[in-house]
C-alpha cells in the first residue's frame, strides 16, 4: 500500500506541483525562483484549462511584480485575475484584488486612482457592515491624501475614523484619531 502523502502528491498535476513549489520559494524569500515556478504553473494551468489555477498563479505573479516595483506588469496580472473572478462571480476575490491595486496605485504615485479605489473600498466595507475594515482603509486613505498634498481631506478621514470609534465607545481610539486630524491641520 502506498504512503497516503505520496499518493496525494502523485494525483497532483505538474502545474499544481509547480504552484506549490512557488509558494514554498515565496515563503523562503526566494522571489526569482517563486516567479519561475508560478510562471510554469500558469502555463500548465492554461493547458489544463484550470481557471482557478490560472487566477491563483496570476495573482502570485502580480504580487511578485508589485514587490519588485514593476507596477505596470503587476496591474496587468491583477486585471487578468479580476476578469477571471468576475466571470466566475467571485466578488470577494475581486474585492481582495481591488485592495492590492489601490495600494499599487498609491505606491507608484498615482494618487487620484488610489483615492478613487480606496473610496470604493470604503463603500464596500460599509455595505458589509465592517467598521474595522472601514477604519483601516480610512487610515490608509489619509496617508494617500497626505502624499497627494491634501491635508484637509486626510484630516477628514481621521475625523471619520474617530466618529466610528466613538460610536462603538472606543474613546481612546477616537481621541487618537482626532489628535492626528488636529496635528495635520496645525500650522507648521
Language-model-detected regions and their locations in the chain:
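Intrinsically disordered, low-complexity regions
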Residues: 1-188
Amino acid at each position: 500500500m502506498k504512503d497516503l502523502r505520496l499518493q496525494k502528491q502523485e494525483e497532483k498535476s505538474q502545474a499544481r506541483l509547480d504552484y506549490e513549489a512557488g509558494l514554498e520559494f515565496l515563503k523562503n524569500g526566494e522571489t526569482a525562483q517563486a516567479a519561475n515556478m508560478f510562471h510554469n504553473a500558469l502555463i500548465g494551468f492554461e493547458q489544463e484549462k484550470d481557471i482557478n489555477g490560472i487566477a491563483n498563479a496570476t495573482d502570485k505573479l502580480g504580487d511578485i511584480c508589485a514587490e519588485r516595483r514593476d507596477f505596470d506588469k503587476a496591474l496587468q496580472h491583477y486585471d487578468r485575475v479580476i476578469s477571471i473572478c468576475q466571470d466566475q462571480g467571485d466578488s470577494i476575490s475581486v474585492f481582495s484584488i481591488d485592495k492590492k491595486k489601490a495600494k499599487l496605485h498609491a505606491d507608484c504615485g498615482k494618487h487620484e486612482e488610489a483615492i478613487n479605489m480606496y473610496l470604493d473600498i470604503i463603500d464596500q466595507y460599509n455595505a458589509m457592515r465592517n467598521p474595522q475594515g472601514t477604519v483601516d482603509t480610512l487610515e490608509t486613505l489619509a496617508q494617500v491624501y497626505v502624499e497627494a498634498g491634501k491635508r484637509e481631506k486626510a484630516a477628514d478621514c481621521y475625523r471619520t475614523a474617530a466618529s466610528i470609534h466613538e460610536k462603538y465607545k472606543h474613546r481612546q481610539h477616537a481621541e487618537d484619531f482626532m489628535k492626528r486630524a488636529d496635528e495635520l491641520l496645525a500650522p507648521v
